[in-house]
Amino acid sequence: MSLKTGRADGTATVRIDYEECTACGLCVRVCKGAPLYLESGTVHVDQTRLFGCIGCGQCVAVCPKNCITVEGRDLFPDDIMKIPSKGSRATYEQLKSLMIARRSVRNFKDRAVEHELIDKIIDAASTAPMGLPPADTEIVVLHGSEKVQEFANDMIDLMHNLKWFFAPFMRLLMRPFIGKEACESFKTFILPIIEIFIKKREEGEDSLLYNAPLAMYFHTSPYADPADPFISATYAMLAGESLGLGSCMIGTPGPFIKYSKKLKRKYGIHLRNQQGIVVIFGYPAVRYSQALKRRLANVHFYQ
C-alpha cells in the first residue's frame, strides 16, 4: 500500500540499469519502503511489497555504480548531486561554534535582507529531514518591514478577538479536557502576553515580531509529522546565522493562525494545515560579547 502525503499518492518508479548493476545489494539494505529485494543474484523491484517505493532516494544515493534512477513523489533524476567533499564540510567544532555564537535576536537594523540571502535560507531549509517523503513543509515569506508588520497586526487582532478564550471562567471549564499544565500556561503566559502585545502596539511598539525586516512562517500538511516545520525552521535559523543575520523563533502565532480560516486564506495557507512556527530575521542592531551555556532538562541513559 503506497504512502499518501499532502503532495504524493502512489509509488515512485524505480529503474535499474542491469548492464551496470553488480548486485552488490547495498540498495536493498537501505530500502525501507521494501520494493527492492535480491534474489538469485539480481535486484528486483516489487511495488506491492510493504509501501512500495516512497521516493526517499536512498537506493540512488548509495549505489556505487550510479545505475539506479527513481522518479516520482517529487523526486526527479536531475535532483541527484555529488556529496560535498569532506574538506568542504563543517567540522564538529565549526558547527558547534556557529550554534554557540547564535543568540535569539530581537533588535534589528533598519536594513532590508537581500533576496539572495532569502534564497539561500530557503535552500538550506529544504534540506531538512522529514517524516515521510516528499516534504510537506511550506513557508510563507514576509519580505520587508511593511509585510511583517501587516502580519503582526493581523495576529494581534486575532489574539485580541480570542482573548476571552483564556479568561478564568473558560480555563475552569476546559481544565478537565486540556489539563493543569495547559491551564497554567494560559494563565501565566498566554493571556499576559496577549495583553502586552496589545498594549505595546498602542504605544507604537511591535513586541510580537520586533519590527523585523523578514519573517518566515513554517507550516505543514495534516499528513505530515508535526515536527517537520520546526526542523526546517531550525535549519533556516542556522543558515541565517551563517549568513550574518540574527534570528528568533516566535511560537505564539502558530496555535492562533491554525484556527483562522480568514488569515489562512489571506496568507496562502491550506485550511487544514497544521500549526507551525515563525522565524524572524534581520541584521542585528546589537553585538553580543559573551555566549551562554544551555542545559537540557534531563539526559537519562537507560541501563
Language-model regions, residue ranges each:
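Acidic, surface-exposed loops and disordered segments
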Residues: 1-303
